[in-house]
Amino acid sequence: MQRTVRIIGAPTDYGTNRRGVDMGPSAIRYAGLGDRLDESGRQTTDVGDLFVARTAGQSQRATDSNARHLEETREVCERIEAEVKDTVESGEIPLLLGGDHSVAIGTVNGATRESPMGAVWFDAHGDFNTPSTSPSGNVHGMPLAGLLGYGEFGEMDWARADGLREENVAIVGVRTLDEHERKLLRESDISVFTMSEIDTRGLTDVVADALATATDGVDGFHVSLDMDWLDPQIAPGVGTPVRGGATYREAHAAMEQVAERDDASLRSIEVVEVNPILDEANETAELATELVTSALGKRIY
């Protein structure tokens, strides 16, 4: 029996210096997410948006640790963690709508409270900077490093997810890395699948390996879908677009592979970085909605 999906909005842009992603949850809902999931046979409940305080001039203010709005990010992620934890304990699948990618810290921490798990990270970026290595100070470039306790995050209990096993993490579709990120990732036990590897081997084989990595020896996995994983020609409404991303059909094929896994093994899922200000006729939010419904089991036949 398929589990109910609990939709949770996290309208935050603390993790980026570009405004607009805080409107992502509204844009995705406007694209008909709830109705499409219902039509696919999934029961849903939408708890609305979690409270996110607004800060005047937030795009200019940074903390001494070179991680902008880290305290505000912590507060939001702790709210997300509590809601996701309750969702998992209720036997439902938490579907987190971002917001910038820093929200993943809350989602994964909430989902790992039950037992250890893996993660498949669909992203153009590594998200593996730390406050001391980040060239921008934007926390949306740090969530994976934060969850795995790298650098200063090792002392931040709210960020570090001890139940996320590094050897069970796979990043899919990477095509741009900072120098320090590249070094840290090479030294880690994370499996990194670049777009070049997808070009060479084919997406189906790469995603199969990523899912195998995420589920090896654990009973659950998390899916983090950053919409900049896709090529900006089909997903223009993202904050940090990078050319050469996944095509429309590749993205759906990947999400369909996620859906082929045992329903009980999908611990949580999030879709992030939809920026309606930069979008064209809500195209990116529409695509996000389609991909989420594919990941949760929608079928043509």
Regions found by a protein language model. Name each.
Residues 2-301:
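Conserved alpha-helical scaffold segments that buttress catalytic/binding sites
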